[in-house]
Amino acid sequence: MPVSGSQLAFDAASAPDPARGVFETLLVRDGRPLQASRHLARLGASVRALYGVALPPGLGVALADAAAGHALVRLRVEAVPHGAPPPLLGVEIAPLDPAVVLPPAEVTLVCVRVKTGAGWHKLIDRSWFDQIEALAGGGVRPLLVARSGELLETTRANVFLLRGGVLATPPLDGSILPGVVRAAVLEHARRLGIAAHELPLTLKHLREADVVLLSGSLALLERAQVRGDRRSAEAADRLAGALAGDVGP
């Protein structure tokens, strides 16, 4: 069942340690880091907000150099404070299974009620997320739900709902990560003429959705629920096709 009927509760508040640093994960295809400027902008915003410093110049060139010559890999860049600006930077390349990108299989969601969202920054300290994933168990994706009943995000992706061909996603209110691919999905929706809204979504909206989509930097777009509405199915296909075009052949 793509969306499990069960709900779990996780009582611990999100309290990661920002001193461990922040990071970005980029998809590299044919030597090109996808959405590099957006990833760097988000990383730079977090470094300024958390540590009061700027990223050193030339990081974009360093990422491009690291990606050069690689057909399909994952690139991770970390910024770690160490007492004096600028932060320590690390760039790492790792193999990536092609099946990870735009996978055709549906994933299963399990709703987990939490006290708070994880917040605006992509922190290296993922212990809170790790505990939630352990609670949910293997083979499922925990979908975080606020005490108010509003949908937040999964532990690794932003969430979109399609109903009647109309796209909706939770707003950027400081409780969820401002996803890079989330922004790309909204841009593609506008370009393709797919109505898209950023607004509070609840479990009722989740139950009524024709299609549930998850957006992330490596998978790009995953489906967690697909029902019979033709308009929503077509919209999901068009969005996936647009993201595939971003990656290239």
Feature map (PLM): residue ranges:
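Helix-start/capping segments and mature chain N-termini
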Residues: 1-74, 78-249
